[in-house]
């Protein structure tokens, strides 16, 4: 490319970034992808790597959608657990009225400190979310789910009444209000969403998410989560194999995907990921069925290796640190300085 065109392109890119914010446009191979965005881990090592910044970005809107029982709420509860481990505060706006505190506790959530709201209407749910964001004291706000945000007019109306586009208008208005507050308070807001089928679609994907198009536009990250298989121990099913696609990502290159296991009553199998990614990266050696690290055998078969790492958390931490160093961009000195100044 000649010099004049290069200058014109860099001027255009600069103008786009000034007008629409950092990350509005980037080169696909750009590994420096907005390094200074703070992130909260998802609880899955593979997904943190696929997201490019080590987790979900703070000060942004995130949408997680998928079919029923695909792991949407499990993933968000893991994010809450990770946030609390870092000393953060989390809130769960339970529009579905289906949060199970016992299950949340098993995933590592401190339910005593978790703020929970079970609103009556969609307007109330989004107003509560907005007030929590504006307080500036909450790190993560989860809305479960967009499909359950029922407009007040629909609740007060008769069962057969048609309320066309009410929910979409509600979401559009709420997100217009929320976005600026979210950026200012540096809060991560996660909307869980369900899938619906478009009628009469002959070609292309008939699936769509509820609540209109506003959330698709306002979300910086959109995750499509699917169950791909079952994990069995003998005849007993002990968990799900899960795949997450990063459908949209404004803070790093998109379209990456992560595969991990969700074990019933335990959540995302972090140690299983450490072993799998460690083998891919050559950090953990696999010879036949045996796994070894630094010449030391850690188990025959993945289950035994996982048990060994559970008993030796310092070794698991060391392997995970090496994996993160290899895949995730190093934080810039400027971001570290800002963080230490805040502390």
Curated annotation (Swiss-Prot):
GO cellular-component term (any): cytosol
Membrane-spanning residues: none
Annotated positions binding ATP: 66-73
Residue ranges, annotated region (Disordered): 319-343
Alphabetized SMART domains for the sequence: AAA
A Gene Ontology BP annotation from the UniProt entry: DNA recombination
Keywords assigned: ATP-binding, Cytoplasm, DNA damage, DNA recombination, DNA repair, DNA-binding, Nucleotide-binding, SOS response
Pfam families for this protein: RecA (PF00154), RecA_C (PF21096)
Gene Ontology molecular function terms on file: ATP binding; ATP hydrolysis activity; ATP-dependent DNA damage sensor activity; damaged DNA binding; single-stranded DNA binding
Record's subcellular location: Cytoplasm
The keyword Cytoplasm belongs to this UniProt entry's keyword annotation: yes
Family stated for the protein in its record: Belongs to the RecA family.
NCBIfam families per record: tigrfam_recA (TIGR02012)
Biological role: Can catalyze the hydrolysis of ATP in the presence of single-stranded DNA, the ATP-dependent uptake of single-stranded DNA by duplex DNA, and the ATP-dependent hybridization of homologous single-stranded DNAs. It interacts with LexA causing its activation and leading to its autocatalytic cleavage.
Record protein name field: Protein RecA
Organism in which the protein naturally occurs: Thioalkalivibrio sulfidiphilus (strain HL-EbGR7)
């Amino acid at each position: 490319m000649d010099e004049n065109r290069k200058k014109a392109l860099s001027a255009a890119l600069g103008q786009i970034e000034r007008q629409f914010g950092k990350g509005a446009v980037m080169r696909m191979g750009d590994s420096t992808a907005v390094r200074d965005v703070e992130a909260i881990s998802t609880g899955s090592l593979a997904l943190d790597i696929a997201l490019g910044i080590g987790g979900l970005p703070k000060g942004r809107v995130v949408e997680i959608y998928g079919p029923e029982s695909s792991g949407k709420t499990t993933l968000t509860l893991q994010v809450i657990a990770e946030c609390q481990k870092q000393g953060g505060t989390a809130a769960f706006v339970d529009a579905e009225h289906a949060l199970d505190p016992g299950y949340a506790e098993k995933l590592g959530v401190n339910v005593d400190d978790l703020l929970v709201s079970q609103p009556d209407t969609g307007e109330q749910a989004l107003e509560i979310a907005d007030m929590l964001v504006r307080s500036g004291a909450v790190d993560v706000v989860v809305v479960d789910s967009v499909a359950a945000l029922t407009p007040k007019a629909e609740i007060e109306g008769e069962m057969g009444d048609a309320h066309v586009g009410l929910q979409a208008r509600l979401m559009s208005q709420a997100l217009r209000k929320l976005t600026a507050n979210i950026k200012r308070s540096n809060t991560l807001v996660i909307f869980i969403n369900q899938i619906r089928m478009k009628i009469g679609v002959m070609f292309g994907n008939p699936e769509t998410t509820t609540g209109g198009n506003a959330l698709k536009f306002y979300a910086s990250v959109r995750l499509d989560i699917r169950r791909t298989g079952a994990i069995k121990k003998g005849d007993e099913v002990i968990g799900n194999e899960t795949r997450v696609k990063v459908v949209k990502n404004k803070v790093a290159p998109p379209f990456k995907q992560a595969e991990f296991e969700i074990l019933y009553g335990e959540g995302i199998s972090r140690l299983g990921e450490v072993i799998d990614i460690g083998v891919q990266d050559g950090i953990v050696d696999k010879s036949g069925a045996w796994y070894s690290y630094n010449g030391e055998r850690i188990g025959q078969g993945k289950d035994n290796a996982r048990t060994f790492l559970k008993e030796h958390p310092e070794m698991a931490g060391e392997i995970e640190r090496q994996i993160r160093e290899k895949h995730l961009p190093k934080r810039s000195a400027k971001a570290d300085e800002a963080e230490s100044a805040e502390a």
